[in-house]
Amino acid sequence: MERIKGLRDLMSQSRTREILTKTTVDHMAIIKKYTSGRQEKNPALRMKWMMAMKYPITADKRIMEMIPERNEQGQTLWSKTNDAGSDRVMVSPLAVTWWNRNGPTTSTIHYPKVYKTYFEKVERLRHGTFGPVHFRNQVKIRRRVDINPGHADLSAKEAQDVIMEVVFPNEVGAKILTSESQLTITKEKKEELQDCKIAPLMVAYMLERELVRKTRFLPVAGGTSSVYIEVLHLTQGTCWEQMYTPGGEVRNDDVDQSLIIAARNIVRRATVSTDPLSSLLEMCHSTQIGGVRMVDILRQNPTEEQAVDICKAAMGLRISSSFSFGGFTFKRTSGSSVKREEEILTGNLQTLKIRVHEGYEEFTMVGRRATAILRKATRRLIQLIVSGRDEQSIAEAIIVAMVFSQDDCMIKAVRGDLNFVNRANQRLNPMHQLLRHFQKDAKVLFQNWGIEPIDNVMGMIGILPDMTPSTEMSLRGVRVSKMGVDEYSSTERVVVSIDRFLRVRDQRGNVLLSPEEVSETQGTEKLTITYSSSMMWEINGSESVLVNTYQWIIRNWETVKIQWSQDPTMLYNKMEFEPFQSLVPKAARGKYSGFVRTLFQQMRDVLGTFDTVQIIKLLPFAAAPPEQSRMQFSSLTVNVRGSGMRILVRGNSPVFNYNKATKRLTVLGKDAGALTEDPDEGTAGVESAVLRGFLILGKEDKRYGPALSINELSNLAKGEKANVLIGQGDVVLVMKRKRDSSILTDSQTATKRLRMAIN
């Protein structure tokens, strides 16, 4: 106070004021400080000082022709004196006003196109709804979030090539645009930005915003999709939150959301297939999301979710080194352990063989609704600090941590037998057995864990076995914190391997992911997901399986027919018949298959009994492993629409109805396609590649005249040769057999020769 009073006295004397305002600054250190380097040391002061001058702006000399010397009020707009050290003109701020009012105008058509992301943001905010403000403690955790709504997902390198091609097309150096998305975007942008007068650097900068995903590691307490992150500063503070509903969605958020749903569906489906890994790859390669190939999205999209990462691992892509257990992402922050197989007894005296982690380790656990720090030793939980949105979320985290710690208390709390199975009816591994057991009911676990008195630590409270908070007691080693645990920030990706059961391991052999970790949550995808793979037919229910199976047979009838007569085993093993098996009552599968295969063999053996419609109808039943039995069936049952429906072996039924007049097949009333050949001419098989009574000699030979249709062949004399047009427009040379005895074997050799002749 004394000093301030003294200074006030000093300032009241006029001499002091004069010294401070008039004296020149000639101390070398001060001059040096403010004049060395290009960096402005006091920008605010500099701006004030410059703007106080009459002509603070310099401009190119051409300005003298474009702007009058004085404005309407007679104020001078520019000075004739040159700027010291350059040949530019000194200009008044009034010149800027004049230029804005009277200067040349330009077309604004390109502005919404170039500044698209800004225009869209304004629209989203205009249509968004801001709700009430709530004051409460915010548990924020840092997460890697997308801060740039409405972008494509190109890599920085791909985007750079696109930008160069669009903005500077004549620059040296050939830019190779490879991906489909690159080519599409380049074409679209070139058309949009024709005759654009906006500075190329600005266009390039704005294009980058549109093409590349930008992520930041930010504290978030609510939604993490980019349309929420762009208003983060409006929706959450340290002790308040404002409700907000975005006024529009952006494609990048929709892609992320739909990718997760597609990946989960595919992993779930692959798990129950005979070869999960190859099935998963087949599905990823044949699926499209919003019209873009799923494999292209997986290569570019950095979304980290269990199912998505399993798909990436299968494609040989790198993924994050953290691992997943019980839906939480674990990252070891210190310590180390060795794994040892050990047999332990549960509270129910069941023996479990588990891989015990020996040693002290610390982990961070991050889930959607709760986070935690876990310190553990060999089969012992030392400390767990957990924070979450609500009681339920905190309980979930505690259960996962207790199971993961392999603590003796947890093992002893098991009541009843552990026999959980996965979708493919295989027993889960012991750790997941334990997890499922306690997720179903954790009462005994919490009751048996033990409680301890707690010290009063700022920001921490205890939690009792019934999950209520307490300031005196807590579950042994467990505390609830107000602060969240940050997500693992590194974007480092590691090389991983995947086995045929979709277990993903790092290079040290630690399991990072397995199908058990894939969430069962069902959602509705924002973008259309098109699964072309037969394995996904069942996603829309049993009816869709039935219709799709028969549609597939009809679409591929030409090749199916040849295989049916030549190589039935290969045909029966086709994966397209796999989904159908789930519709056939389990007890009947083998019997039906044996019956149908026998029937088909009789058709092959006895000339003239080839019945197209019947083969199509019964073929899917022959795919199951056959049981030898003498049983005959007049109808076969399939489970659709929640009950057993009959397919008649001979004749039509509501399930399978062939209309001879229109040659169209309807399955459960849905059109399944048309048969191109007339089933009545079964043995002739107008389009058939099986030419009975003829020998295929090889490729077309022009000396034998123009190609005949199969019908014209009957006019040939024995031993005569002719070119003939078969199935898919291929022409081959044939000879009519001299004797009829070997007709039966023709069909076998015909197809083999056909293949050779055509290829």
UniProtKB/Swiss-Prot annotation:
InterPro entries on file: Flu_PB2_2nd, Flu_PB2_6th, Flu_PB2_C, Flu_PB2_CAP-bd, Flu_PB2_middle, Flu_PB2_N, INV_PB2, PB2_helical
One Gene Ontology term from the biological process aspect of the record: symbiont-mediated suppression of host mRNA transcription via inhibition of RNA polymerase II activity
Molecular-function GO term, any one: RNA-directed RNA polymerase activity
A GO cellular-component term linked to this record: virion component
Compartments, as annotated in UniProt: Virion; Host nucleus
Origin: domain of life: Viruses
Protein role: Plays an essential role in transcription initiation and cap-stealing mechanism, in which cellular capped pre-mRNAs are used to generate primers for viral transcription. Recognizes and binds the 7-methylguanosine-containing cap of the target pre-RNA which is subsequently cleaved after 10-13 nucleotides by the viral protein PA. Plays a role in the initiation of the viral genome replication and modulates the activity of the ribonucleoprotein (RNP) complex.
Family the entry assigns: Belongs to the influenza viruses PB2 family.
Descriptive protein name: Polymerase basic protein 2
Source lineage: Viruses, Riboviria, Orthornavirae, Negarnaviricota, Polyploviricotina
Gene (name only): PB2
